[in-house]
Amino acid sequence: MENGLDLRGTYETMLGRIKAQGGEKARLGMAVLMWISHSRRPLQVDEICYAIAIRIGSNNLDSDDIPTISALLDCCEGLVTVDKGVSTVRLIHFTFQEYLCTHPDLFDRAHSTMAETCLTYLNSQHAKDLSVGPSLDLRGHLFLAYSSLYWGAHMRIELSDRAETLALQLLDINKI
């Protein structure tokens, strides 16, 4: 039990460091932790960079707004690492995942935020510009797979009015 208390104190200190960065670095660090701890599957490096760059409700994704993975890791104070072999991001240890799961207050509306982010991406001009056909080219659409597969899963866990509006916008038959 003592080791668990030591780890809890360590994680609280590290999270305090992330928040103490203030401003954009604190926002990015906490957003990365939210995405990794609440995603429905491990995220690829490019997926998390895109997810963090999306502004909910925006129709455009500016490539200049997409952070580098090194910038995101820097904001996380050593709590996140990249598995080089499979190019996914993960928390440094399973006990940190357990810690985050037992502290849901750290991430206000995590699943609704994630659903809104996925739906914003799917409703964006970037995703709509994808031409469907026999030679479907997904390069440059690095968040498409995750957002199209998991927006509903996040929405089922935690529904928000905004997510519902974005889902109805996506499914609007008049736009197809």
Predicted regions and their residues:
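Leucine/isoleucine-rich amphipathic helices and adjacent mixed helix/strand linkers
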Residues: 1-176
